[in-house]
Design a protein with these regions (language model features):
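C-terminal hydrophobic structural anchor segments
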Residues: 156-190
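Long, contiguous internal "core" modules enriched in hydrophobic/ aromatic residues
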Residues: 2-165, 181
Length: 190
């Protein structure tokens, strides 16, 4: 259960980078050396309210399916057992399909969801399509995301299509790193 639940919850938490979390920051406590904390949860759920947001859950499921895919690719590469490799390829196919569905939902949300933006006068406002605009305003990050996606898909598809091919992790892992870095950059830009 830990192998599925942990990536699901971590992905859900990362989804809050885009949707926000319910906590309050006490700016007066920042300069107070004796203050043990500067932020507190705004409710008694302590962040678990994130699972009530569909985008966060979609993001979490995407991360979970990706983790299972990468684990399958790693084991196919490192364990010399044809019977196990056949079972792992079946798991890889199912989980990659789940990953693609969740990725599509997340990308649709990226194009349409609102995000915090700052106008020329320094005023913060909610901008529709903010993360999509962030992506197209940073062509290097867009290229990084697309290259990562191509590497990931290449690793998975080659492993699924060629029974003798076992090195899909060597494409998928660097692709995952590039795509995830791009997603964090999209969240952090202005």
């Amino acid at each position: 259960i830990n192998g599925c639940l942990a990536p699901l919850l971590i992905g859900t938490a990362v989804g809050t980078f885009f949707t926000g979390s319910e906590f309050m920051v006490n700016k007066n406590a920042v300069a107070d050396i004796g203050a043990p904390v500067i932020s507190r949860w705004a409710n008694n759920w302590h962040g678990l309210e994130a699972v009530t947001n569909p985008f966060n859950v979609e993001f979490g499921l995407m991360v979970m399916f990706l983790a299972i895919c990468l684990g399958s690719l790693y084991m196919i590469n490192n364990i010399d057992d044809d019977k196990l490799a056949t079972q792992l390829r079946k798991s890889l196919l199912i989980c990659f399909a789940g990953f693609l569905v969740m990725l599509l939902l997340v990308l649709i949300n990226f194009i349409t969801m609102e995000g915090f933006a700052v106008d020329t006068e320094g005023k913060v406002f909610m901008e529709k399509g903010k993360y999509f605009y962030n992506l197209i305003q940073m062509p290097a990050v867009l290229i990084m995301f697309l290259l990562g996606a191509v590497l990931l898909v290449t690793g998975v598809v080659m492993t699924l299509m060629k029974k003798e091919f076992r090195r899909g992790i060597w494409f998928a892992a660097p692709g995952t790193v590039l795509a995830v870095m791009a997603i964090f950059m999209i969240a952090g830009y202005n």
